[in-house]
């Protein structure tokens, strides 16, 4: 599901790999010509498949990873409290998306394509799809705040590398919110997806807020009641079943 912290983790892991291999930082991801860095495909996969307006791409499964590759390769899944995701997605849909959303946040929460129910469907699909697979790392956005060292170390080990604690520390420091915002202001490391839509509007930045549990500032009580009802269908593995307004200050 988008807005779950993938870009943050992507920068963190990419920085580690650049240090580990002594290569220039590249957050682009998959590159068939690379002979040094591990080839990592960053994708929203099922979500992109559901959201594409191209009937041809949907029929061809353009965004879907073949099952053979999925079973053969290590997988990392970044997930986040759907309530926080919905708030972040709303600002993205209003400020950054090529298909700008014209409705209210309450309408987005209930939207069939990208609302709460769609998120639950995608998250459940991934849990079922990866059931029984041993080389999977589930990365909770909140834990990227609370224990980034442990998660990045686990990710590096999953890639078959011997983690270097100093490089882990440097990569985490590099990917902190303030530096990510500065990088975005400076051109997003040459990548359009890490560039602000409008530099004068903080809500249009890819790195917008970076907090855990801030959804209460934007979602009305009736929205939270609706989301809670939808989350009853979410696999309890994720732990997002009850509305608890958490500390909204960055870690």
Which role does the model predict for each range below?
Residues 21-46, 132-217, 221:
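The conserved 3'-phosphoadenosine-5'-phosphosulfate
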Residues 1-139, 208-251:
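PAPS-dependent sulfotransferase catalytic domain
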